Every structure is written in C-alpha cells, then in structure tokens.
Amino acid sequence: MNFHILTLFPDMVENGLKTSITGRAIESGAISVVAVDIRDYTTDKHRHVDDAPYGGGAGMVIQPAPVCDAYEALCKKLGKRPRVIYMTPQGRVFNQSIAQDLAKEEDLVFLCGHYEGIDERALELIQAEYLSAGDFVLTGGELPSMVMIDCISRLVPGVLGNGDSAEVESFYDNLLEYPQYTRPEVYEGKPVPEVLLSGHHKNIESWRREQSIRRTLERRPDLLEDASLTLKEQKFLDSLLKEQGESRLKELEQLVREAVKSDETPGSDREYYQQMKKVKKLLNEKKATLQELKGYYKVLGALKQEI
C-alpha cells in the first residue's frame, strides 16, 4: 500500500514513520510513505503558500493553487486519482472501521493543513474527504495523518509479524482487547490468571473473549451497541448487565413479541418462537448485531401498529 502525504513539513512525517512497525514495513516494501512538499508547487521565489483570508480574520489560509498542483502532479505520476483525506477537526472522527475501509486502497493521499486551513476551492476541486483525529485542535494535520497511517498500516498484509495480531486488538470486533500478562508468574503478590497457564486453548480463548466484553462494558459501553457477539456471548453480557438492572436480550425479546403478536392474532406465539429461532441463528453466526435486530423489530412493530 502506498501513502502519499501532501504537507509543508515533509521531514516531520517521513522521519516519524521510519521507526518501529511502520519503519520495518517500509523497508520490507509492504507499504511506502512519500511526503510531497506543497511548497515545491509555488511560483514565487519566496515559496509562499499562504495569504490573508478574504473577509478578514485571524491567521493565514493556504492558497488553492499549490495544493491543487501538487495533487494533479501526483495523479499524473500514478495514472489515476486516488482518494484524498484532509485532516481537519470538521471531519468524521477516525476509528477502526474507517481504517479497515481505507486499508483496501492501493494508494491513499493525506492532505495536511496548517495555519487557519486550506482554501475551500482546493478541497472541492480535489474532492477531499474530511477526517478528524478527535474533537480538539492541533497546529497542523501532520500528527493526525501519522496516527492514521500507523493504524491503517497494521491492517495491510505482511506488516505485522503475527497474522492474527490485528484481529484481536482493541476495536477490531467493536470490543476492547483482553488483559495481557507475561513473566513472572507472580508479581507483587498478584498472580497470572490460572486459565492462561492451563494450556487449554479453547478455555483461554473463551476467557479472553469474556474479558474483552467485561472490559468494554466497564470502559467503553458505547461500543457494545454495534459489537458482534454470539448468543452465548450475549447471555454473558446480560449476566453482567443484570448486576446493573439491565438486560439487552430481554429488550430484544419484547420487541420481537410486540412485532409479531396481538391478542386477536391466532398463532402469534408460534410466529414469535420462529422469529426468535431466526434471531438466535443470526446472532450465533454473527450475521447481525443485537442493535441491528432491535432496530429491525422496533420498526416492524411500529409499522404493524400503523396498519
């Protein structure tokens, strides 16, 4: 995969990505990172890229011509027009799902703004997509672009030494990663969980999955809405939620019942059980999340009431 970074500070991004995993990936050829200096596409001897904003206001704005010319030169070199990601707090907040989508690209362009941003016309002409590292303001787009490239690179085949590494890390399945342990077996009176020493791989996998669910509930419960869980895992989550007086499965069952049953409808009990059988099958095969099913039956029930 090839990353192209349009920036005013090429040394910053190239040097920052030439270490650790991304550095080894560059050396092996799994990825390439090329920084393009936007100043190389200016026309004056002082290489100015910015000017005062029309309408007044603080700061300076990057002019459209150097940005567009840099991108068009890259397109000519590649023989195609790759996706452009503009780093801005106005964009969608970057996450693992977006990373997985971007990792499918062969070439990806990151546009790093500075000062008060980039002339809007340039962004429109190059059809930039807006992404943000979070709801905060930085001096420029270089650091966010490096963060995103690091994340996306890990999903590129051949970058990680262990092919399973990316699949068990936090957010891959909308769950946080399970706790990790290494030697010594006991430290400051705190032992490693016995199951990890058992050598029983199935039990270890089950324990890790449950720990991921438990940790996500404690630290990022918002992620559970779209987590892909089997029926057994849903029941485990429900057992944790019951301690808080909640039950996600009970809520789904009630929505299914309301969607298929009314006092005047004969055979609705049978339809309810048939629907729940399908629901359990979809959950076990991870073809739908609990949240998706709840949404479906909520709408179905509302439509029946309207009819």
Predicted regions and their residues:
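Charged, low-complexity interaction regions
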Residues: 260-270, 282-294
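Hydrophobic/aromatic beta-strand patches that form the interior of the parallel beta-sheet core
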Residues: 4-6, 34-36, 85, 108-109, ...
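C-terminal accessory regions appended to core domains
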Residues: 208-251
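N-terminal nucleotide/polyanion-binding subdomain common to many enzyme families
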Residues: 1-74, 202-218, 222-225
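Structured adenosyl-cofactor binding patch, chiefly the S-adenosyl-L-methionine
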Residues: 118, 122-169
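S-adenosyl-L-methionine/SAH cofactor-binding core of RNA-modifying enzymes
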Residues: 63-114, 119, 157
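Amphipathic, heptad-repeat alpha-helical segments
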Residues: 249-276
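Internal, active-site/partner-interface "lid" segment
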Residues: 143, 155-195
